[in-house]
From Swiss-Prot:
This is E3 ubiquitin-protein ligase rnf146. It catalyses: S-ubiquitinyl-[E2 ubiquitin-conjugating enzyme]-L-cysteine + [acceptor protein]-L-lysine = [E2 ubiquitin-conjugating enzyme]-L-cysteine + N(6)-ubiquitinyl-[acceptor protein]-L-lysine. It comes from Salmo salar (Atlantic salmon). One of its GO terms (molecular function) is ubiquitin protein ligase activity. InterPro entries: RING-HC_RNF146 (IPR044110), RNF146 (IPR033509), WWE-dom_subgr (IPR018123), WWE_dom (IPR004170), WWE_dom_sf (IPR037197), Znf_RING (IPR001841), Znf_RING/FYVE/PHD (IPR013083), Znf_RING_CS (IPR017907).
């Protein structure tokens, strides 16, 4: 390999005409900045289209970076993390080239794909491929966009992914200077410069199509609204098996439902084991289920505190309820009424 001295020596040995041309080229490069060579994209292995520079200073196509971001928010070369808002505010190496390509020459044709509330223009490379296939009379053309293979149906003027035919998007061929949203997912904002299509709060597909932020928020809020609406709204069940008020029933209301005077309130707390075991248990069995669901508002003195009273109160309560039975129902109730003896066994009265 030649050293630097040898290279300098070989250059100095050139004819004066050659040296003059070289000097003029150097002076021209110092006086005006020539067009930089288009860098190669390490993702698509082609020359970059709308090249963007990541914070790690690696350069890729904008759509290639967008397609890679669906897998991970990291650089494809050094694996350094890419900022979350990079696709919204990309660092373009040649923003003027994007604007020039978006305007084009009057009368030139360009290809567009349908977005939400407008049309997006394909990038220059894809437009050339579509125009070439269209001029040759081909029915379909394949395109590599953001790492995905798309098929353009030039007869029906739709595009779709090659492995997913269900989702179709309209395409069209029109003049280049029609109103449009942007080029290849990059918005042409005349006031604030060029922005990514996600800058307006949009979720973007791989090919640069957009979805409005309102639709995304509504879709995200729909499950929450459904969950709120689907909450059980049944009224709380009272101890007597009848619907109560939305608030916790008072002790007097509960006693009134059972036809017990307030003076017998201390004895009421133990209904369920003695006299009412055969009749009131079915209605009481639904109360624990209702309480477990959390749909009823139960006070502390009406739920779990029924099994802590002395046995004497249970006996007195059973006897008082037997005495208060209706006169006409003595014969029928005597066979079904039970009481608990001190030995813990239930016997018929």
């Amino acid at each position: 390999m030649a050293s630097c001295g040898e290279v300098d020596h070989s250059v100095s040995s050139l004819p004066s005409s050659k040296k003059g041309s070289g000097d003029s080229a150097c002076s021209g490069s110092s006086g005006s900045s020539p067009a930089l060579p288009v860098p190669e994209c390490a993702i698509c292995l082609q020359s970059c289209v709308h090249p963007v520079q990541l914070p790690c200073r690696h350069v890729f196509c904008f759509l290639c970076v967008k397609g890679a971001s669906w897998q991970s928010k990291r650089c494809a070369l050094c694996r350094q993390e890419v900022p979350e808002d990079f696709l919204e505010h990309p660092t373009l190496l040649s923003p003027e080239e994007l604007k020039t390509g978006g305007r084009g020459a009057t009368g030139d044709n360009a290809w567009y794909y349908e977005g939400r509330n407008g049309w997006w223009q394909y990038d220059e490379r894809t437009s050339r491929e579509l125009e070439d296939a269209f001029s040759k009379g081909k029915k379909t053309a394949e395109m590599l966009i953001a790492g995905f293979l798309y098929v353009a149906d030039l007869e029906n003027m739709v595009q779709y992914r090659r492995n997913e035919h269900g989702r179709r998007r309209k395409i069209k061929r029109d003049v280049v200077d029609i109103p449009k949203k942007g080029v290849a997912g990059l918005r042409l904002d005349t006031e604030g410069g060029v922005q990514g299509s996600a800058a307006a709060g949009r979720g973007n597909s791989a090919d640069g199509a957009d979805t409005s932020a309102a639709a995304v928020q509504q879709a995200a809020a729909a499950p929450a609204a459904t969950t709120v609406l689907s909450a059980p709204a049944r009224p709380p069940t009272s101890l007597g098996g009848q619907p109560g008020s939305p608030t916790s029933p008072s002790l007097e209301d509960t006693l009134a439902l059972l036809h017990i005077s307030p003076t017998d309130a201390p004895e009421r707390a133990e209904v369920g084991e003695g006299e009412e075991e055969a009749t009131a248990t079915p209605s009481m069995s639904s109360s624990p289920n209702t309480y477990a669901d959390g749909s009823g508002d139960w006070s502390d003195d009406e739920g779990d505190g029924e099994a802590v009273e002395p046995r004497e109160q249970r006996l007195r309560l059973g006897e008082s309820l037997v005495d208060r039975s209706p006169p006409g129902a003595e014969a029928s109730s005597s066979s079904s009424v039970r009481s608990r003896r001190p030995d813990g066994q239930c016997t018929e009265v």
